[in-house]
Amino acid sequence: MYTKLISIIILVGLLSNYSFGQNKVVTISGLIKDKADKSALPYVNVILKTEKDSEFVTGTVSNDEGRFTLSNIKPNNYYLEISFIGYVTKIQSIYVGSLSDFLDIAIINLEKDIHTLSEVTISVKQDEISSKMDKKTFKVEDNISQSGGSVLQTMQNLPGVTVQDGKVQLRGNDKITVLIDGKQTALTGFGSQSGLDNIPASAIEKIEIINNPSSKYDANGNAGIINIVMRKNKEEGFNGKIGFTTGIGSLWVRQKNLPSIRPQYQFTPKINPSLSLNYRKKNLNAFFQVDNLYTQTLNKNEFVTRVYDDGPIINQQLKRNRNTNFLTSKIGFDWSINDNNTLTISGLFGSEKIIDRGDQPFFNEDNTERLRLWQFLEDELKTTVMATAAFQHKFKQAGHLLNIGFNYTFHREDEKYFYDNFLPSKTGIDAFKLLSDEQVYDFNFDYIKPLKYGRIETGIKLRARNIPTNMQFILGINSILDTNAGGWATYDELIPAIYGNYVYENKKWEAELGLRGEYVKIQYEVNPNHNTYKSDGYNYTQPFPNARLAYKINSRNKVSLFYNRRVDRPNEVDIRIFPKYDDAEIIKVGNPTLRPQFTNSFELGYKTSWDKGYFYVAAYQRVVDGTITRISSVVPNSNLIYAIFQNAGRSYNQGIEMVFTQEISKWYSINLNLNVYHNQINAFSVENKYPVPNTFVAAKQEIVSGNIKLNNTFHLPKKIDAQLTAIYLAPDIIPQGKIAQRFSIDLGIKRSLQKGKGELFLNATDIFNTMIVKKEIQGQGFKYTSTDYYETQVIRIGYNYKF
């Protein structure tokens, strides 16, 4: 009796387990890496087959981070087939049981196929737009028509990017945070952008453009984030790259000088040597990189006509001949303490020397009488030192990470200006010195935990920043400088922040929800003897949420919806109280009462892909409160114009961006980018306090503008590649005025030599010399038009060799 009862219980249990196992489904996940350098491999083919008869079950490709997920897998014996061009295909057996809903395979390492790599050159071009549609990635080496130039010049050709007045704009907005290797640095500006026109592109591997950052990024930068990724070799053993580029610009005079000034630069030389070394052995990777960019440029050649309601008409020219030498070097090591712990130590040094020789003549309406000649010499040295330490701990589960980092930056700005003021009846001589030492301390703690259908990201960050500045006027004879506006000022910034981000993903849906909380305290101490401004500051505690919802129609079509809230804090130079006299009669001054602007951004994007191309379209809107802009005004009994930053109220930016990429044939492919947007600045009224209080009132401004970029790439015989880039920028509104249309065409060719180790390139920018900047500014009681014929046409030739 008992024996029969026990037999029945066992049979029922077995049947129950069998039934449960048959209905059970499991999610398989893993992380694919390069076996040699441990870097994640995106876009790897992953196929699941049954072990019994090799029947295909399902398949996928790894994402941007090398991760893959296979859902709804029934318990059974299987094997994975992992393949990627240039790597040995790997077969891995796995057993999917019924006791867990989630099977983590951990890390799968792929070995490079040495035989394949020695016989052919592998060229795989990934989509610039990431699978999440929140980021665009561009390799510098693919930008043939701008090879050998600066980072700023390289960005001019990128989809969605425009360059105006030396600053990068994303979708018509220059409020961008620029990172180097994921960190803010003094080289590119904390909270703003600077120095991009002097960083050599030879030092850069790729550029990432993030239009919709998640909460793990700093909240600063309403237009988005640009991350500049420096070169770092990943091959085993000792290897490196050496390069040399030279060029010449300003091939002819586009617009003759006004009478009686020094000649403008012509046939300006450019020289850029570079060296990158790397040694990787077992658990140690050491790297060293040095680049030097020397340029002569006609930095500015602007012709201005000023018209006053109750005064004369003045014609003027601002010509600035510039010599620049920028040296940057980076050294460091990655130490894999064991399989789970890695320590990275690195240091960066940058030295930028700028010599400007400027001439600014002023004439009457018909240029028959010179009213004044302003000449200046600017001698500026910027020195940057940065030290970084980063520790990463990998838990047993793939993708389960703890990152701890510390970053210290020192940046010195040492400027000397010498002025000569020639008037019909007398001559004046003046000078001033400015010294600014910036110190920044950054600490971050980031934690990532994979979940069954996604992951959690959380962390904290602390920044402390101090910038004491001292400006000293050195009075000569017949001085016209505002000596009471000199003295000292000190900027202090403290920003602790905490964030959390949750990412969910299944077969059809993706969702991301994040929140960043920031406390900001800014204090700006001003010399009490300053004639206009007093000490000021502000503090706030604000939430910065972000959200993303995506629907995968199928493997080739996807729709994403984004929202985020961001802030743009005034940078120290925006509130700096000292007048700048590089233009003698349009004088720029900071404003300590300037406050942050806050932005709410919305975006709806769609991407469809096919075998040899893709199409991406996004509709976006930004609403900005407290818009930061520079306002120009005049004061009674003076023709001088003072340009001062102000908060101008609310503004709007709505638009549509499209990117179309297609390989037409084996030898020709295109990338077309179209961006159309509507800009609107509501009516506002502000008070400029310098040099005396005056009120400015502006009516509503709005315009429909945009830009088109067409990149044509040709793969020619004998391993020759060519690129032809056409850029058109439509008229747009700027503070108090408009900027006219601009267009240019760039051309570049390169040839692979020495079995792919060498590369020779030749390019020319703005080959028809058409990139001219025309502006119209309307103020109260005055207006002016300007046309800038600065140097845009440059021819370069260069050679790179990998070893």
Task: Mark where each language-model region is.
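Gram-negative outer-membrane beta-barrel transporters
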Residues: Q646-L729
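A short, solvent-exposed loop/turn motif at the edges and junctions
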Residues: E51-E55, N77-S93
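Short, ordered, surface-exposed loop/turn motifs in non-cytosolic proteins
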Residues: A36-T50
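Membrane-proximal, glycine/serine-rich, low-complexity loop/turn segments characteristic
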Residues: Q22-K24, V88, F102, E119, ...
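Short, acidic Ser/Thr/Gly-rich low-complexity loop/linker segments typical of extracellular
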Residues: E51-R67
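Outer-membrane beta-barrel translocator domains and adjoining extracellular loop/strand segments
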Residues: V253-N257, N299-G311, D356-R370, D414-L423, ...
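Signature of Gram-negative outer-membrane beta-barrel scaffolds
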Residues: D430, E457-R556, V686
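Outer membrane beta-barrel strand-and-loop segments of large Gram-negative receptors
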Residues: V440-N444, A485-G487, N591, R595, ...
